[in-house]
C-alpha cells in the first residue's frame, strides 16, 4: 500500500518539476500534470480543518484527438500534509471546454462525506464533440480548491 502511493507521489513531483512553467499541456496521446494544493482551512461539524502545504493534485489523461480512453485525478500529500486529517466532504469533477473556454460538459463526482488524505477518481472514456481542454477540479466542502487542465488538440 505504501509503495504504490510513494510511486504515485514521486511521479507527481517529477511531472510537476517538468511542467512548472506550463499551466496546460497538449494531450495528443498521454498527458499528466500536477498542481500544488494551496493551504486552506474549512469547517466540518463545528471543527476547523486545515490542509497544510505539501499536497499535489495530479490529472492524467490518455487518448487521441477528441477521444479520451482514460482519465484519472487525485491528491498525493507528503511530509506534514500526509499526517493531516485530509479532505472531508470532497469530490472530483471533470469538465470539458471548447477553444473559446466555454464549458460544454461536466462529469460531477460523488461527494464523499468521509475524510481522506488521498482522494482519487477515475472517469469513463469520452468522445468529445470539439477540441479545447479537459480539466479536473477538486472540490472540498462545496468550494473548488484546485484545478488542473490539459489542452485537447489535433
State where each predicted segment sits.
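Cysteine-centric signal of extracytoplasmic or virion-exposed proteins
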Residues: 55, 77, 88, 115, ...
